[in-house]
Amino acid sequence: MAQLEKFLENVPTFDERGNYQCTVLVWQDAAKERFFAVVQDPRCNLVGKTPADFDGERVILADLFPVFVPGLDAIKRVDEALIIAEDYYVKRHIMAPCLVEHSPVANQMFKDTVAIEVEVCHKLMHLEIPNIAKFRGCVVHEGLIVALCFDKYAETLTQRVMRSASSLNKAKVMDRLRTAVSKLHDLGYCHNDINPANIMFASLSDDNPVLIDFDSAQRMGHDLLKVGTPGWCVEELRTSSQENDEIALRNLDEYLTSCGCR
């Protein structure tokens, strides 16, 4: 086995009743191969630990990640040198839940979730919408899309409200977000997970909100592959719907008012 480098995931998993099941560790070696181990420790402390301390099983990436297809309108392929030079944020989808289930259905759902996020972000990228996270392309390994690259942002709306709620112009924030969501709807997609953690700002002084995280996005009327955040979405809805986004925006407006935003 190649020299082990770093942990990528340390994720506790729970059943439908909220009972702890296990903790899944995922790591990557120098050859970019990924491995996972399941441990029975809800507080799994990795201080002083290395992947070599665990009996890992190789992750079959082809079971989980979509194929990168080059072409005229292809998704841009981003290499590590560019990621470092441009200081991009690299989003790696959390594999732990489907690794626990370890079924063809769970694997395909994970693969489809990655694929739809790439599809949505690629289409949005060409519209140059200032209030939607700037997608820069994908990290490709062995012909598979294993991560997405975006511009980095400084803090979430949750963090901004905790730090300086009174400095936020609620009307401006909501107007910009509604415009961004409207553009998404015009393309035939819904976000389905609008909440304060999925809204960011480019710097600590910037007041221009940016909508991020499109792994719950889906074409209107299609079944959701990943449901939104409880309390911010219509939890009983299992299809992609403008209603999900509209309710989330209303909840967001009320949230900002309750936090004392001007």
Predicted regions and their residues:
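Short, hydrophobic/proline-enriched secondary-structure or compact coil segments at domain edges
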Residues: 16-33
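Catalytic-loop of the protein kinase fold
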Residues: 185-202
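ATP-binding glycine-rich loop module of kinase domains
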Residues: 32-126
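Conserved alphaE helix
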Residues: 169-183
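Short, glycine/acidic-enriched loop or turn micro-motifs at the edges of active sites
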Residues: 154, 196, 216-218
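C-lobe/activation-segment region of protein kinase-like
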Residues: 94, 112, 203-262
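Conserved structural core of kinase catalytic domains
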Residues: 89, 94-113, 122-125, 131-171
